Amino acid sequence: MELVDESVHNGLHDATKFKMDFVTLPSTVAPTQPVVLRFTPKNAADNTSLKNLKIVHEMPMHLLMVSHDLSWFAHEHPEAKPDGSYELAFRFPKADKYHLYADITPADASHNQVFKLEKTVGQASSVEPNLTPNVRFSGDGYEYELRSEPTALTAGKSATLTIVISKGRKGVTNIENYLGALGHMVIISEDREDFLHAHPEDHAHTTAEMKDPSHSHSGSGSHGAMSHEGKANGPNVSFMTLFPKSGKYKVWAQFNIDGKVRTAQFVVSVG
């Protein structure tokens, strides 16, 4: 596997070149019960397995999962198998329809490919998201504030989202790398069709890249670039991205603080 240092990738995959087979073992999944998620990336032309994926942020595959109502989120990394498949032993927390975004970068691809998949667990009610804009989050004694530049976010225009982290009213300055980055940000639109993923590096894209070569990261998967301000390890961490359309978006930001990966969540509105 080739090592690659990328901060952003395309959202939608190129269906003319790549496909993703997805099965669960067992096929019927019950909440809280063990299940194996198996992903097999393939060449679309001849249906052969893609066995040489690039390593991006220390992993060949990043799997982002959300519940249908966007109240639950997970960031996992399926393990490579000799036959070219990737497996993850998992337990879904509740009955629901889950949306899975499998993010890979084939060796012969110029950017990443994101595959949007779905799995219904138990008797899912499929409650729609009810998102209310919120730029503050508290958890485990830490306070997180999301600041945007510009303040009014606009579809199709670049924006910088800065997360300010504090504890006891003091800025946190001991943020450590997580998967080769100071932080990770995942952004998903209210309809779950647009997916953005940002990291602390110097270039950015979105799913709009698949629709518009100008690049950004969204639609059905993407990444945005991230830089950090002030001290290299906090308290401000800034992510640059581009929202592909107007509407509400759920934002998850992950940081490694005091040896633990902590996840903050927000909701932003884009005009």
Where are these regions (language model features)?
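Intrinsically disordered, low-complexity terminal tails/loops enriched in metal-binding residues
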Residues: 1-271
